[in-house]
């Protein structure tokens, strides 16, 4: 009687996946094989797959059985509670013992014989599943017993410790609006940048420390220096241009004379074309000054017709102002020197 449900194989036969072939069909396969019929012809006649026929005939030739299942039955249980207990004892005595050493111990102590001793993989599975958690708990307890008392943690930045301890007054530093308040246990007075800042790496901090230690007065810190910019310095007077009075320059430009045949001079003159100013000689205030009165100029300089190409501001310098005052000073210094000798 064929089953009412199942699948159809490549030969048109019906089989149920996951269930063994019925014993009647198995016996018929063996009988046809003993009659000398080839396995391929048996599979076509009984509409059973080639692999199934070959497997049943091979098992019958090896064991003489046509029944399904493992050949000879399953292996008897070897991981008995007694064996597990001895394995736990070995592991507690020597936590670093290997599975093959436990297997040898079981044979040496007579717990098992060579027929029922567990394999190395079975012992490893027992250690991992049944004894692993207990062994880890025992190691943790023993570690806690032998662990020394916890030492206080090092404070932050212990290499460059702060000179004064953190007090309640220091913790109450006001914070600007919009910035979240720092709790008292975290807030600390800032005296210098941390050890990882650029100022500490470059050695600026040691210089400021020496200054602050040697001087009783308050010295600005490095972070205060960085706040100083160009805006803090007084700006130059708006009426001065390159150190010269703007009013004087405007007057010279306003009353400049027409060119007298010489090429025009721009507003910029290179430094190489200008002669250096002579340094006036030092004259003692207790000596008489014998400069000639002709060294003084009565009129304005821009009213003279003569000019020189050394005018740096697009105006002409009178030729009569050939530094007569400087020449008079030189003459006066020579006369004073001669009189002193």
UniProtKB/Swiss-Prot annotation:
User: Where primarily located?
Assistant: nucleus
Q: Which UniProt keywords apply?
A: Developmental protein, DNA-binding, Nucleus, Paired box, Transcription, Transcription regulation
Q: How does it assemble?
A: Interacts with KDM5B.
CDD domains per UniProt: PAX
Gene from which this protein is expressed: PAX9
In this chain, the stretch annotated as RED subdomain covers 82-130
Function, as annotated, reads: Transcription factor required for normal development of thymus, parathyroid glands, ultimobranchial bodies, teeth, skeletal elements of skull and larynx as well as distal limbs.
Name of a matching Pfam family: PAX
Where is the protein situated, by its record's location annotation?
A: Nucleus
Signal peptide bounds: none
**DNA-binding residues per UniProt?**
4-130
Q: Which GO terms describe its molecular function?
A: DNA-binding transcription factor activity, RNA polymerase II-specific; RNA polymerase II cis-regulatory region sequence-specific DNA binding
| Region called Interaction with KDM5B, residue ranges | 168-189
Question: What is the protein named?
Answer: Paired box protein Pax-9
Q: Which Gene3D superfamilies match?
A: Winged helix-like DNA-binding domain superfamily/Winged helix DNA-binding domain
Q: Which organism is it from?
A: Callimico goeldii
Q: Where is this region: PAI subdomain?
A: 7-63
**Record keyword Transcription regulation present:** yes
Report which superkingdom the organism of origin falls in: Eukaryota
Q: Which PROSITE patterns match?
A: PAIRED_1, PAIRED_2
GO CC field: nucleus
């Amino acid at each position: 009687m064929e089953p009412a449900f199942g699948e159809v194989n490549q030969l048109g036969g019906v089989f149920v996946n996951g269930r063994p072939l019925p014993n009647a069909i198995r016996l018929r396969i063996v009988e046809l094989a003993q009659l000398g019929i080839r396995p391929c012809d048996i599979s076509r006649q009984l509409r059973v797959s080639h692999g199934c026929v070959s497997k049943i005939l091979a098992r019958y030739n090896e064991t003489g059985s046509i029944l399904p299942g493992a050949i000879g039955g399953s292996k008897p249980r070897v991981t008995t509670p007694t064996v597990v207990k001895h394995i736990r004892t070995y592991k507690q005595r020597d936590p670093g013992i290997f599975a093959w050493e436990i297997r040898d111990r079981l044979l040496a102590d007579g717990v098992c014989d060579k027929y029922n001793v567990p394999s190395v993989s079975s012992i490893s599975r027992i250690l991992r599943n049944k004894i692993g958690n207990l062994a880890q708990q025992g190691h943790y307890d023993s570690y806690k017993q032998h662990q020394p008392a916890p030492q206080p943690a090092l404070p932050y930045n212990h290499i460059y410790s702060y000179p004064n301890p953190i007090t309640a007054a220091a913790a109450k530093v006001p914070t600007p609006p919009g910035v979240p308040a720092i709790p008292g246990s975290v807030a600390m007075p800032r005296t210098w940048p941390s050890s990882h800042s650029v100022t500490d790496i470059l050695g600026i901090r040691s210089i400021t420390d020496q200054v602050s230690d040697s001087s009783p007065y308050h010295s600005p810190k490095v972070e205060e220096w960085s706040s100083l910019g160009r805006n803090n310095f007084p700006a130059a007077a708006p009426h001065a241009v390159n150190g010269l009075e703007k009013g004087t320059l405007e007057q010279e430009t306003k009353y400049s004379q027409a060119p007298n045949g010489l090429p025009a001079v721009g507003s910029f003159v290179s430094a190489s074309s200008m002669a250096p100013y002579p340094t006036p000689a030092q004259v003692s205030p207790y000596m008489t000054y014998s400069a000639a009165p002709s060294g003084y100029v009565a009129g304005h300089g821009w009213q003279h017709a003569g000019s020189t190409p050394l005018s740096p501001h697009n105006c002409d310098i009178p030729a009569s102002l050939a530094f007569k005052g400087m020449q008079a000073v030189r003459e006066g210094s020579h006369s004073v020197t001669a009189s002193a000798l």
